[in-house]
Swiss-Prot record:
The keyword Metal-binding does not apply. SUPFAM superfamilies: L28p-like (SSF143800). This is Large ribosomal subunit protein bL31B. Part of the 50S ribosomal subunit. One of its GO terms (cellular component) is ribonucleoprotein complex. PROSITE patterns: RIBOSOMAL_L31. Belongs to the bacterial ribosomal protein bL31 family. Type B subfamily. GO terms for molecular function: structural constituent of ribosome. It comes from Stenotrophomonas maltophilia (strain K279a). The keyword Ribonucleoprotein applies. One of its GO terms (biological process) is translation. PANTHER family: 50S RIBOSOMAL PROTEIN L31, CHLOROPLASTIC, LARGE RIBOSOMAL SUBUNIT PROTEIN BL31A.
Amino acid sequence: MKADIHPNYRDVVFHDVTSDFKILTRSTMATKETIQWEDGNEYPLVKVEISSASHPFYTGKHKVIDTSGRIDKFQKRYAR
């Protein structure tokens, strides 16, 4: 087996910026940001726009999640 070809599998905090939900899990995602977790340790931070904490399918609530302004751009373009 070749040495040093496998990705670094480590503890990472995922932060759903839409619902302000954070979860500590393991991943190979690379990031430069870090955050101090509840246990006092510092972990790499990966920000995501949507997760099961904010997705309408999992929450049962229908709400529009638009983080890049696409809905406003569409409504302005096709407004009557």
